[in-house]
Amino acid sequence: MNTTTYIGHCRISFFNISSQGFWENLKSPDVVFGYSLPLLEIQIILIFFCIVMSHMFLRCIGVSQIVSYMIAGLILGPQLFDILEKSSGKLSADPALDGTAALRCISVFGRLMFTFLMTVRTSRRVAFHSGKLPVVIGIVSFFAPLFSLSFLNLFTDNIDPHYMSLDKALAERTVIVITQSQILLPSTTYILLELKIINSELGRLALSASAINDMLGIFAMIVATTQATYIHVSHAIAYRDLVAVIIFFLIVFFVFKPMVQWIIDRTPEDKPVEDIYIHAVILTAFASAAYFVFFNMKYVLGPLIIGIIIPEGPPLGSALEAKFERLTMNVFLPISITFSAMRCDGLRILSQFTDIYFNIFLTLLILVIKLVACLTLCLYYKLPRSESLAVSLILSYKSFVEFVLYEAVLEEKFISQATYAFLILYSLLSAGIVPMVVRSMYDPKRKYVNYQKRDILHLEANSGLRILTCLHKPENVSETIAFLQLFSSPIHDFPIAVTVLHLVKLVGQINPIIVSHDKKLKRLHKNSYIHTANLAFRQFMQESLESVTVTTFTAFSHENLMHEDICTLALDRTTSMIVVPSGRKWTVDGMFESDDLAARQLNQSLLDRAPCSIGILVDRGQFSRKSYVTSKNRYNIDVGVLFIGGKDDREALSLVKRMKYNPRVRVTVIRLIFDHEIESEWDYILDNEGLKDLKSTESNEDILYTERIVTSVVEVVKAVQLLAEEYDLMVVGRDHDMTSQDLSGLTEWVELPELGVIGDLLAARDLNSKVSVLVVQQQQQQT
């Protein structure tokens, strides 16, 4: 099929689209290169073949797949372009419709979609959530490298006029300084996701600093483009373009933003956004790109600004991501990155090294200035050395996101092909080396290392208790309040400070964020579950006669990174214990219903990393229902503590001792004693010290104490099953180091290892009981 277009009165431009295959001319099979569709198909096949082959080797040494995209472009570059040059004459007599036309269109489309989706998934609000330090770093990291502008006039005598005129050479140096000074937020976000530290304190700091820097960069880009138009084109056109940009911002903020909010408001909760609105938003993003091109601005600015306006997360943000992310990230983005790298001719760096060596010097100088500036600020604000260096490297990271800028200035002839090739190779080295260096020097687990005692056992007897509770689903609210009611007391000398954290799986945004409900964000209050839960906790606080204070937060986070948000908040709130639901769900009759594997995995991560003690609550239903029933008797909640021995049991004992001030709770401590020699004398001494005040009935009237002698594992199991029928809630330690040999025979039958041996027995599916269980692990002290 041929398309013929008449242009003016003197030239015919034809463009061959589809062919009849290789058999169209068997003597010359390369005839297919004269048709755009077969050529595009061959290009895409070669691109993904080289990507797959490159990644097969690079993934063995931990290099990200993005580097494979770049290397595929370098492999295909000069060789493929030779083929394209041969095909251009066959494809079209119009030089604009050469062999790269179709591939370039896909590349631009991919770049637009990627920029739009990344800004939709990236919340700029993160810039204001980490205090003063990221703001200072963001500003300094942008302006400090501009100091290198003072070196622009060095070695101007050595500029070869055949390479570039003096004015253009100085403009090229200026472009390098500006592009290298800017830190693109999507680039920072990508490396943090790759390193899986986006939820860490370091990740939040880097994101915030990058957001500030990126805002300054966008403003500088608009000013620089307007100035270039003013100087090289026309004063009137420059003013027109600037006014057009201002009008665009006004339309976006006062027309498009309210329309987006209207779409969100009219979408029922838990219902998808209608396709017509999704398509309208996408078309608006494309229209904004065309608008900016018409007014001589970078086309990516339009989708970027449109993406910023769209609220992250459900319903609209997540709908856009679900509909377009896979196609963009798995098809269009690889083609876009590879196409940009295909334009890189590494041989030009060698042949024109004397012409670009000063550009290389400027790039490295800016890198050093940025590293030193960020490192100095981080050390000044008392960050550890390793974290300071990691932040500096992350903010100096260059990757495929910068290709948009490089290609734009190349097409406008602000930089040469040799400089472009160097910048591509520089980004390739940065994308491959920086993640491995940061990974080797920074472990996110170190964030939660705590050398101070952060448990209940070591609290002062009359000090307040700080607890962090986590909620996954609406049914977690009642069981959590029921547990907290055990500590409420009319005695105000023993206050309880509760931090409630709603855990929301991140779907439509890329940046995790923790929001305090004291700020009354509209979108959060429109979530009926969270709003209702907050009202329930507020009522609980009012009914507790000021003995309990409750602060609520919501964490939007990725499922596999939620433990980092929990640990960070636990550190910030100086909590002594984190309480999380087990993930095992029961029916109203106490029958097993389901297991939440994601919740169980989260609990295991917390057990390994928590900076304080942790409790896992298994609620069969009766405990939470009974806590709301007011009994005429003094006690209506029976809590049993099964004490075998070890630090976790001592922590569990310290916890229940704080329940004795609640007149509705009766606590019984049952100690199981094995009739053989104790393995650890020191643990035995510590156990007796913790139980000493309970053994004396005169000094302790609120907690009952009893001992049972067991001779075998079978008797332990029978004792646990009998106790499960007597109490509403059983509190047990997770590990029992002292008697590991006695309980070792049960470990191979454990279904829920995060609950330990005894906890697993009490939470077993076939246990004919309605008892709820709290499994306690004392803070894992790091050395």
Swiss-Prot record:
Tissue: Specifically expressed in pollen.
Residues passing through the membrane, by range: 31-51, 61-81, 101-120, 135-155, 175-195, 205-225, 244-264, 276-295, 300-322, 360-380, 389-409, 418-438
Membrane topology value: Multi-pass membrane protein
Gene3D superfamilies: 1.20.1530.20
Pfam families: CHX17_2nd, CHX17_C, Na_H_Exchanger
Main location: membrane
Compartment(s): Membrane
Keywords: Antiport, Ion transport, Membrane, Potassium, Potassium transport, Transmembrane, Transmembrane helix, Transport
GO BP: potassium ion transport; proton transmembrane transport
Record bears the keyword Cell inner membrane: no
Keyword Ion transport carried by entry: yes
Matches recorded under PANTHER family: CATION/H + ANTIPORTER (PTHR32468), CATION_H(+) ANTIPORTER 10-RELATED (PTHR32468:SF169)
This protein's name: Cation/H(+) antiporter 11
Gene for this chain: CHX11
